[in-house]
């Protein structure tokens, strides 16, 4: 049940912020700024030095707020997946499908969201127990691909990541996205130390996601 509790919370966020950074403290501040703006799905990437330490700090900090779901991104192998899970990650994201990562996530009852790009990769992921896939990079795949995949995989839960912005967010949902992943368009101001701007952008994205969800009820 734990896996589906975390998965449900993740999907309910509507939008997952992809957090990167050159150093630990900047990445943590970016995460805090995004959450302050109402984006409560957080993919904390393991390209950040000592990401497991930051992940532990963040998951403990926000543990009492169940609407906030913090997971690990750019997880390339099973060792890193286990490290992230033990640090408190509530979901695992990778740029491509890795069967060993899928096994670890299944063992710990943690949702695994691999990046996929072809029907073959999608089928392999589904057969390994994956419930939500990431279409990456979304900017290359495009809206028509999301729509086309819904033909052979009508129940597929999809999170496009890469190329998602405030201006095209509604189009992604209309094409069949279950939720979206937002990266540089959301957090780019953090690179210049402008965390207030990150919060302001997150507020706009949160409002847009809520409007889209409301219109589909």
Annotate each PLM feature.
Residues 1-79, 83-87, 107, 155, ...:
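Conserved N-terminal beta1-alpha1 strand-loop-helix module at the mouth
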Residues 80-125:
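Hydrophobic, well-structured mid-protein blocks that either form specific transmembrane helices
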